[in-house]
Amino acid sequence: MDSRTKGKTVMEVGGDGVAVITLINPPVNSLSFDVLYNLKSNYEEALSRNDVKAIVITGAKGRFSGGFDISGFGEMQKGNVKEPKAGYISIDIITDLLEAARKPSVAAIDGLALGGGLELAMACHARISAPAAQLGLPELQLGVIPGFGGTQRLPRLVGLTKALEMILTSKPVKAEEGHSLGLIDAVVPPAELVTTARRWALDIVGRRKPWVSSVSKTDKLPPLGEAREILTFAKAQTLKRAPNMKHPLMCLDAIEVGIVSGPRAGLEKEAEVASQVVKLDTTKGLIHVFFSQRGTAKVPGVTDRGLVPRKIKKVAIIGGGLMGSGIATALILSNYPVILKEVNEKFLEAGIGRVKANLQSRVRKGSMSQEKFEKTMSLLKGSLDYESFRDVDMVIEAVIENISLKQQIFADLEKYCPQHCILASNTSTIDLNKIGERTKSQDRIVGAHFFSPAHIMPLLEIVRTNHTSAQVIVDLLDVGKKIKKTPVVVGNCTGFAVNRMFFPYTQAAMFLVECGADPYLIDRAISKFGMPMGPFRLCDLVGFGVAIATATQFIENFSERTYKSMIIPLMQEDKRAGEATRKGFYLYDDKRKAKPDPELKKYIEKARSISGVKLDPKLANLSEKDIIEMTFFPVVNEACRVFAEGIAVKAADLDIAGIMGMGFPPYRGGIMFWADSIGSKYIYSRLDEWSKAYGEFFKPCAFLAERGSKGVLLSAPVKQASSRL
């Protein structure tokens, strides 16, 4: 169902003379065009009826509204829905019809009032809320701005500073805080919500409660000079934090116009900006990510078979290192009882200590109470053998990347675990078929690849072999959802989706450095592009041991298209291992602050002499644009291989995997979306040119060559891919 035929409102007039309008658009009563137009007609009817004294707006099934139906943007871009004139909804309907009405309205808020939902509530003359309701304007994280008057009403209700905090961080507040801020007029139990709202509306009519038009309020606004200072500071901070995104600054402009020139001018500016931001590339990228993230759990041939997830009552984890302890933390935080197995008491104590430290950091930050900490820790039990595995529903192996060790573990697990138990490996690079070679029940072997730190990073790669049952995938998708991860189901290959796509990223950077490029300029250019850090800073962070082990797997499996640099092995010989030893590509002080190391030059020169690479003046003086293209186009090339081989069913899954696993900037939409925004023809021509000049590493794969020569979208579905899912 698209936004043209989605949702409705229902109006009921009681004997007390209050018309209750209910928003109905499951699951969160989003404000589709249909809902908004229905609301308009209900309002017009209520205003024209003599038996209606006041109006209450509420949402069906315990939720007020989750905001504007974002699919409406997509429908407008496709031309399926005519875009309303700028300000039609925010000014003509919400301000001039609803807020300026001669009959008062009260919002009865339960569950959530987010985005357009909160904006609608703020236009009412009072707001009554249930205690658990969440109130916020999260639009900026979706690439748009509050477009239903939120830029004008929120500062007038809660003050400019708090409004900026809520809008710029996209973080909601609970009803009690909303009440203390002045956003909510009263907090009542859910059962009394509509009754209280009706009474409040009649009290406004009887002048026992104030009739407040929030857009006209000025008592919470600071003096003009102070407001300008606050906004100037907010703009500087925003530019520093998100230099590649225009929409937050455009949002601040709308707020400023309203404060300087009055609310009407502010609403007009907001309407103008709202219609402009939907055309920005960053907005298109963020909206693509929003929908793609929700689509990763839909796997053709798996989730469309009516399979019901089995209940996972207990999980065992083998290995209490950084990864194993992180996975254990994620599970117990979501109320899963966990057994953590180690080889000796010392390692077990250390593993449990890591889990404890992960939770204690939450207590220190105030996001977890001491009581909750103790209750959560009680879900974790330690073990030195497999005896306690006899009643577990899932085991996740998280030991070092050693094939024979993993094979032995999986063979042992089969002897102790029940028949239904899922046998999962957290390997990041090793072929799952090899890991399960000595195991008879291949249908329950699956990859559960978390990213470090596992209790924080949002991605879970679910890796399916040719034998893994659909039921196991459905079970793991359910676990992923419950532990608040975004699961992406991929096929089995070296490196799976994320590590495989991105192995050329670091190798391309190493190649450029050996040819004369400055590593620090490369890191700067890539950080400026939007990555959390550049490839050299990343190598230091993960440590050279991990970097070498990972690179070795790819060099062994894809020798024809890898670049083997000796820079890291040479540094490792000199006891440099990255940030942990305070020496890597950078030098680190006591606070782990990085600074360039003049000694790096000697390792680069030595590596260059070993590889036989000659200094190339052209590559030594690359522009930022060239650096981005030469490091990321090989990633696009490998992503095309992954897609063509059926390792991923949808290009959008690769977009989400890259964003959540490697920190690819979300506002660029993901690696495949970004590639399509540049054009397959251009990417193909550049890679082809570099492969002729610098070798096989840059050679476009057949999939990219075919699509690039015709200018076809790289993300278009693969019609006859032999899917590995």
UniProtKB/Swiss-Prot annotation:
Reactions listed under catalytic activity: a (3S)-3-hydroxyacyl-CoA = a (2E)-enoyl-CoA + H2O; a 4-saturated-(3S)-3-hydroxyacyl-CoA = a (3E)-enoyl-CoA + H2O; (3S)-3-hydroxybutanoyl-CoA = (2E)-butenoyl-CoA + H2O; (3S)-hydroxyoctanoyl-CoA = (2E)-octenoyl-CoA + H2O
Major place of residence: other
GO BP annotations listed: fatty acid beta-oxidation
Keywords per UniProt: Fatty acid metabolism, Glyoxysome, Isomerase, Lipid metabolism, Lyase, Multifunctional enzyme, NAD, Oxidoreductase, Peroxisome
EC number: 4.2.1.17, 5.1.2.3, 5.3.3.8, 1.1.1.35
Active-site positions on this chain: E119, E139
Localization in the cell: Glyoxysome; Peroxisome
Motif Microbody targeting signal per UniProt: ranges: 723-725
Expressing tissues: Highly expressed in senescing leaves and at lower levels in flowers and siliques.
GO function terms (MF aspect): 3-hydroxyacyl-CoA dehydratase activity; 3-hydroxyacyl-CoA dehydrogenase activity; 3-hydroxybutyryl-CoA epimerase activity; delta(3)-delta(2)-enoyl-CoA isomerase activity; NAD+ binding
Record-linked SUPFAM superfamilies: 6-phosphogluconate dehydrogenase C-terminal domain-like, ClpP/crotonase, NAD(P)-binding Rossmann-fold domains
Function: Involved in peroxisomal fatty acid beta-oxidation during seed germination. Possesses enoyl-CoA hydratase activity against long chain substrates (C14-C18) and 3-hydroxyacyl-CoA dehydrogenase activity against chains of variable sizes (C6-C18). Possesses 3-hydroxy-3-phenylpropionyl-CoA dehydrogenase activity and is involved in the peroxisomal beta-oxidation pathway for the biosynthesis of benzoic acid (BA). Required for the accumulation in seeds of substituted hydroxybenzoylated choline esters, which are BA-containing secondary metabolites.
Domain description: The epimerase and isomerase activities are contained in the N-terminal region while the dehydrogenase activity is in the C-terminal region.
Protein family membership: In the N-terminal section; belongs to the enoyl-CoA hydratase/isomerase family. In the central section; belongs to the 3-hydroxyacyl-CoA dehydrogenase family.
Protein name: Peroxisomal fatty acid beta-oxidation multifunctional protein MFP2
Organism in which the protein naturally occurs: Arabidopsis thaliana
Designated gene of the protein: MFP2
